[in-house]
From Swiss-Prot:
Keywords: Glycoprotein, Kelch repeat, Membrane, Phosphoprotein, Repeat, Transmembrane, Transmembrane helix
Post-translational modification Phosphoserine, affected residues: S89, S361
A GO term from the CC aspect: membrane
Record protein name field: Kelch domain-containing protein 7A
Length: 773
C-alpha cells in the first residue's frame, strides 16, 4: 500500500536527513577503531610473553631508529643522553624493548630475548668469571662503571684520560675472564643496584676483584662483572662509579706500617618508564646513592720518622661514614606520531664532595679534607727503651725534625729520650709536641726549653689555636711572664724620615750609657708616628711617609727576644700624630690629625676595630695619653682644658676639667695610681702636677727651673720617669711622699737626628741564647 498525501512526503524527508548522519557516524567509528588499534599496538606486553614470542619478535620486529650514546668526556656529575629506540611488533603480546646502544662502545651488553636464555647466559658468565685473586688489571684501569639495567647500557660516570673508547658494536666483548674490562665496569659485587638485589630476575655473577699493585706504584685497576637477567617490562639506566685510595706509611727496612684506606662509591639509577602512571604523560625517577668509607690501621710504634712507601695490601675493611640517597619524580610530555617516549630526567648532583682520581689517589687524599685523618691518629708514643741516641743520630742526623706528608697533614716524629733531648732543635713547628712528651716523661730540661720557645714567640703562639688552645691557664700565664725575665730598659727610637734611616738604642742606668739595639726598617720611617709596648713587643704606628707626606696606616712590631721586625694588621684609618696606649691586652690608637675616632687592636686576632669615639666630637691633636687604674686618660694639645677618661668596662668616655695652670702640657704619665702631668712655661721652666686616679684632685708637686725648656716625651721605668729630649734627658723620681727631679743630669741621646720616641722594653740577658722563628 503506497503512502499518499502528507504522510509519504514526511517519510521522504526523514530518509533524506539520515544520510549525513550515517556519514558522520561511519567516520567516527573509523577514527575510534584506528585509535584503539594504535593504543593496542603501543601497549607494553607482559614479561612472560617475551620468551614465548621470541621467534615472532625476530621475524616481525623492524628497527625504526637506534638510540646511541657517545661516551665523550663530560664534567663530573653530568649524564650524557642518547636517543631512545622503541621496537614494536605487529603481533599481539609483543613487549617493548627500550635500549640505549653505543655503536662505538667496546663493551656493549646484548640482552637475550627470553628469561631462560638470559639466566643461562648469567650462569655461563658466572662460570667464566671467577678470576684469581691475583688477577692483573688491564692497562686502562677504569674505576668508572656502566652496566645495563632493563635493557640500557649506561655511560661512565667520570671521564678518564688515557681510556679512549674504540669504534665497535655488537655483543659483549669479553675481557679478562670473560668480563667486560675497561671504562664500562659494574660497580657492585653482585652487578646490580642495591634496590634490586632481592629481585627474582637478577643474579649476582661475581664479587669484587682484588686490588693489584704493579711495581710498587699506587695505580690500581678494577674489574667488574656485567649484569644479566634484566626485566623486560621496564626501561632504566644504572650509573655507578667507585674510587679508592690507599696511603701507606712504612719504615724503610722494617715491617711496621700504617695504612689509610679510603673509598667512595656512587650509584645512580633512572627509571624512565612507570606503567602505572596516571595521566597522559609518563613519569621517570632518579635514585642517587652515595657511600664513602675510610679506615686506618696502625702498627707498633717505630723509633724513627716513618717513610712514605707503597704497600701491596690495604688496611682493614672500610667503615661506612656517610651514606645518602635521593629520589626525584618527573613528568614527561608525550611525543608526536603516536609513540610515547619517557623524558629522561637530568642528572642530579651527587651529595658527596669531589672524589679523588685513581691515578694520583694519594695526592687526592691530601687535597680532600673529608678524607684526611686527624694528626692524633698518627702520633707515635715515646719508645719504652732509652738507649736510642744512636738511632737519633742515624735517622735525624741533620738536626732538624723530619717532616712528611701523610693524608695532607704534617707530622713530627722525633724519638726523644732523656739522653737525646738536648740534641733536638726546638721551634714553633715541634715545641708543643715536645712539651707534651716532656710532661709525660718528666723531662724538666726539655719542658723548660719548650716554654722558652713559646715565650720568645708569644704573638705567634697567641694567634695559633692549636698551640695556645692546648695550654692551660697556668701555662699561658707562665709563658707570658717569661717574656719579662731580664732587665727593664729605656728604649728610644730615633726617627729620621728625611734620611730614610732610624735606629733603636737602649739606656743603661747603671753605667749612664747608651747602647745600640736595632735598626729601624725603612718602611717604618715616617713623621708623626707613635710607639707603645705590649707583651714586651714594641709597636710602631706610622704617620706620614716621605716624600710627599702621604698618611700611612701601616703598623710594625719588634720582638726584642728574637730581634725580628714584622708587620701586623694595618689601621682602618691613617692616624698621623695619634697616641698609642696599651690596656688589658689591647692597643688603643687615639685621635690623630682632625680625627675623633679611636681604634683598638686585638693581638690574638691580629685585627683593628673601632672603639667608642671621643666625646662631643672633640678631635685630639698634639695631645698626650696614658693608662691608670684600668682607664685611659687623654689631655693636652687641642684638649688643653679638658681631661678625657675612658672606661673599658662601660665602653664610654667622660669629659672633665683639668686642674692646675693654663700652661702647655708636654706629657702625662701614670705611676703607682697617680697621674703626673708635665707643663712647660717659657719663663718658669717645668712644672709637675699630680693627681690621684680615685680623687681626681690636681696639685703641683715639683718644679724644674729651666728657661725656654725644650719639648720632650716621657717613659716610666719602675718609679723613675725619664724625660727624653733632643738636647738633654731628665729623670723624675715618682716617690709617693716626696716626688722630685734627680739632681744629676743624665747623658742625653747620642747624635739625635730626628724625633725621639721613648718606650720601655725588657731585654734578655746577653748570655742567654734566643730562638728566632
Amino acid at each position: 500500500m503506497l503512502p499518499t498525501g502528507e504522510g509519504a512526503e514526511g517519510q521522504d524527508w526523514h530518509l533524506d536527513m539520515q544520510l549525513p548522519s550515517k556519514v558522520v557516524l561511519s567516520a567516527a567509528a573509523l577514527l575510534l577503531v584506528t585509535a584503539a588499534y594504535k593504543l593496542y599496538k603501543s601497549r607494553p606486553a607482559p614479561v612472560g610473553q617475551a620468551g614465548r614470542n621470541n621467534k615472532d619478535h625476530k621475524a616481525e620486529n623492524e628497527t625504526e631508529a637506534l638510540g646511541q650514546l657517545a661516551f665523550q668526556e663530560a664534567p663530573p656529575g653530568t649524564l650524557p643522553r642518547g636517543r631512545r629506540r622503541r621496537k614494536a611488533s605487529k603481533g599481539a603480546g609483543t613487549s617493548l624493548d627500550y635500549s640505549l646502544v653505543d655503536p662505538e662502545d667496546p663493551c656493549i651488553l646484548d640482552i637475550s630475548r627470553s628469561e631462560e636464555a638470559t639466566r643461562k647466559g648469567s650462569d655461563e658468565s658466572q662460570g667464566r668469571q671467577c678470576p684469581d685473586s691475583q688477577q692483573v688489571p688491564p692497562p686502562c684501569g677504569g674505576q668508572e662503571a656502566g652496566t645495563d639495567v632493563r635493557g640500557k647500557p649506561n655511560p661512565p660516570h667520570l671521564p678518564h684520560s688515557g681510556c679512549e673508547p674504540t669504534s665497535s658494536s655488537g655483543r659483549l666483548i669479553p675481557g679478562v675472564g670473560g668480563s667486560c674490562v675497561g671504562d664500562k665496569l659494574s660497580p657492585w659485587p653482585d652487578s646490580r643496584p642495591p634496590e634490586e638485589t632481592g629481585s627474582g630476575d637478577l643474579e649476582a655473577p661475581n664479587g669484587w676483584t682484588d686490588l693489584t699493585l704493579v711495581n710498587g706504584d699506587m695505580n690500581q685497576s678494577w674489574i667488574f662483572t656485567h649484569m644479566t637477567g634484566v626485566s623486560r617490562g621496564e626501561a632504566g639506566v644504572l650509573q655507578a662509579a667507585a674510587d679508592m685510595g690507599l696511603a701507606t706509611q712504612q719504615q724503610e727496612g722494617a715491617t711496621n706500617a700504617s695504612h689509610t684506606f679510603s673509598s667512595v662509591a656512587r650509584i645512580r639509577m633512572e627509571e624512565n618508564i612507570i606503567q602505572k602512571a596516571e595521566g597522559p604523560g609518563l613519569k621517570g625517577r632518579v635514585y642517587d646513592y652515595f657511600v664513602e668509607s675510610t679506615s686506618k690501621a696502625d702498627s707498633r710504634p717505630v723509633p724513627c720518622p716513618a717513610a712514605l712507601a707503597d704497600a701491596p695490601s690495604p688496611g682493614p675493611g672500610p667503615e661506612p661514614l656517610v651514606t645518602g640517597a635521593a629520589s626525584r619524580d618527573e613528568a614527561a610530555n608525550t611525543a608526536g606520531g603516536g609513540a610515547s617516549e619517557a623524558a629522561s630526567p637530568q642528572p642530579v648532583a651527587s651529595p658527596s664532595a669531589p672524589g679523588f682520581s685513581r691515578k694520583v689517589s694519594l695526592l687526592q687524599i691530601a687535597e680532600n679534607p673529608e678524607l684526611q685523618l686527624q694528626p692524633e691518629g698518627f702520633r707515635m708514643p715515646l719508645p719504652a727503651h732509652l738507649d736510642q741516641r744512636a738511632q737519633l743520630s742515624s735517622a735525624c742526623s741533620h738536626g732538624e725534625p723530619h717532616v712528611q706528608l701523610v693524608a695532607g697533614t704534617n707530622f713530627f716524629h722525633i724519638p726523644l729520650t732523656p739522653a737525646s733531648a738536648l740534641d733536638v732543635r726546638l721551634d714553633l713547628g715541634n715545641c708543643y709536641e715536645m712539651l707534651t712528651l716532656a710532661k709525660r716523661q718528666g723531662l724538666e730540661t726539655l719542658k723548660e726549653a719548650a716554654y722558652k720557645v713559646l715565650s720568645d714567640n708569644y704573638l705567634q703562639v697567641l694567634r695559633s689555636p692549636d698551640i695556645y688552645g692546648g695550654l692551660s691557664g697556668a701555662e699561658r700565664e707562665l709563658i707570658l711572664q717569661r717574656r719579662f725575665r731580664g732587665h727593664k730598659r729605656l728604649v728610644v727610637a730615633d726617627m729620621c724620615p728625611q734620611d730614610d734611616s732610624g735606629r733603636l738604642c737602649c739606656y743603661d742606668n747603671v753605667q749612664d750609657a747608651w747602647h745600640p739595639l736595632a735598626q729601624l726598617p725603612p718602611e717604618a720611617m715616617s713623621r708623626g708616628c707613635a710607639l707603645c709596648t705590649l707583651f714586651n713587643y714594641l709597636f710602631v704606628v706610622s704617620g706620614c711617609q716621605e716624600p710627599g707626606g702621604q698618611p700611612s696606616n701601616r703598623v710594625f712590631c719588634y720582638n726584642p727576644l728574637t730581634a725580628i721586625w714584622s708587620e701586623v694588621c694595618p689601621l682602618n684609618q691613617a692616624r698621623p700624630h695619634c697616641r698609642l696606649v696599651a690596656l688589658e691586652g689591647h692597643l688603643y690608637a687615639i685621635g690623630g690629625e682632625c680625627l675623633n675616632t679611636v681604634e683598638r687592636y686585638d693581638p690574638r686576632l691580629d685585627r683593628w676595630t673601632f672603639a667608642p669615639p671621643l666625646p662631643n666630637d672633640t678631635f685630639a691633636l698634639a695631645h698626650t695619653a696614658t693608662v691608670c687604674a684600668n682607664e685611659i686618660f687623654v689631655t693636652g694639645g687641642s684638649l688643653r682644658y679638658l681631661l678625657l677618661r675612658f672606661s673599658t668596662q662601660e665602653q664610654r668616655w667622660w669629659a672633665g676639667p683639668t686642674g692646675g695652670s693654663k700652661d702647655r702640657t708636654a706629657e702625662m704619665v701614670a705611676v703607682n695610681g697617680f697621674l703626673y702631668r708635665f707643663d712647660l712655661n717659657r719663663s718658669l721652666g717645668i712644672s709637675v702636677y699630680r693627681c690621684s686616679a680615685s680623687t681626681r684632685l690636681w696639685y703641683e708637686c715639683a718644679t724644674y727651673r729651666l728657661p725656654y725648656p725644650d719639648a720632650f716625651q716621657c717613659a716610666v721605668v719602675d718609679d723613675h720617669i725619664y724625660c727624653v729630649g733632643r738636647r738633654r734627658m731628665l729623670c723624675f723620681l715618682a716617690d709617693h711622699i716626696s716626688p722630685r727631679f734627680v739632681s744629676k743630669e743624665l747623658k742625653g741621646f747620642p747624635s739625635a737626628r730626628g724625633t725621639l720616641l721613648p718606650a720601655v722594653l725588657t731585654l734578655p740577658v746577653p748570655d742567654v741564647p734566643q730562638t728566632p722563628v
